[in-house]
Curated annotation (Swiss-Prot):
Residues involved in S-adenosyl-L-methionine binding: D131, D160, L161
Organism: Mycobacterium tuberculosis (strain ATCC 25177 / H37Ra)
Name under which the protein is recorded: Putative S-adenosyl-L-methionine-dependent methyltransferase MRA_3827
Cysteines joined through disulfide linkages: none
Keywords recorded for this protein, A-Z: Methyltransferase, S-adenosyl-L-methionine, Transferase
Length: 308
């Protein structure tokens, strides 16, 4: 189904289902003998959403060999491995910001992210989660039913990031006069190019000097029409459909040229340092990523930025 500027979703459909897919990957990774991440809430949240395919993956009932094409460059197991290092990257970003004295954290498009419940935040930290109202309500109710307690002053901010969300954030208690740590994890591909620019402008306007931003860039902006990338994704998701999970990830992304995020932010007063997925995998002694089209493999897709 084609995207529209005002489409909405729950956690079992459309863009919302990608949040559940990511949570299932975290749950699966947390079950490893020597896990790189600890997310005790991922599995019960995925169970509560009720998508059978994702529940089976999260709980270990479904084996990668049953789903992934052994000759394909990318699949469910590969995605889960890359999600592990992505999660570690953003976890460490928040921990580093807290150690530096930043006491406001903002999770943009939080989905089933449970960092407000599982990270060891300093006692005076406020964590803001911004996402669609139905997503936030579902997560809050599910975690309350589990008896989970936030590890910070957790504020839910129901808003659509494609539109006017800064006012909602301020109403939630955000103080633009104090530094903040922001993350945009797995978000930009699901925003139209102009909405990506507006979001970065809003973050800049709301950020006091010393604020930090970590983001995952959408590398498909200039290469999105690459038949090789599209075929890689569609080959992987073909196995999902055979197991009853119909999610066209490729169709959920917005096409069109985009600003390169680090250059855009550098022009707005941020200092940026980039990292590739390959570097993150190597840092944890994990297998290298599959071969990507020329021009993609060496482009950083993770950026940590400091204002001022």
């Amino acid at each position: 189904m084609a995207r529209t500027d005002d489409d909405s979703w729950d956690l079992a459909t459309g863009v919302g289902a990608t949040a559940t897919l990511v949570a299932a990957g975290r749950a699966r990774a947390a079950r490893a003998a020597q896990p790189l991440i600890d997310d005790p809430f991922a599995e019960p949240l995925v169970r509560a959403v009720g998508v059978e395919f994702l529940t089976r993956w999260a709980t270990g009932e479904l084996d990668a060999a049953d789903v992934d094409d052994p000759d394909a460059a990318w699949g469910l197991q590969r995605m889960t491995t890359e999600l592990v290092v992505r999660t570690r990257y953003f976890d460490q970003f928040f921990l580093d910001a807290a150690a530096a004295g930043v006491r406001q954290a903002v999770i943009l498009a939080s989905g089933l992210d449970a960092r407000g419940y599982r990270l060891p935040w300093p006692a005076d930290t406020t964590v803001f989660e911004v996402d669609q109202p139905r997503v936030l309500e579902f997560k809050a109710q599910t975690l309350a039913g589990l008896g989970a307690q936030p590890t910070a002053d957790l504020r839910m901010v129901p808003a659509d990031l494609r539109h006017d969300w800064p006012d909602a954030l301020r109403r939630g208690g955000f103080d633009a006069a104090e530094p903040a740590a922001w993350i945009a994890e797995g978000l930009f591909g699901y925003l139209p190019p102009d909405a990506q620019n507006r979001l970065l402008d809003h973050v800049t306007d709301l950020s006091a000097p010393g604020s930090r931003l970590a983001l995952e860039a959408f590398l498909g902006s200039a290469d999105r029409d690459s038949a090789r990338v599209e075929e890689m994704i569609r080959t992987a998701t073909r196995g999902w459909r055979e197991h009853g999970f119909h999610l066209d990830i490729w169709a959920l992304n917005y096409a069109g040229p985009r600003h390169e995020v680090s250059g855009y932010l550098d022009n707005h007063g941020w200092r940026s340092v980039g990292t590739t997925t390959a570097q993150l995998l190597a840092a944890h002694d994990l297998p290298a990523a599959p071969a990507l089209p020329a021009g993609l493999a060496d482009r950083p897709n993770y950026w940590t930025c400091v204002l001022g």
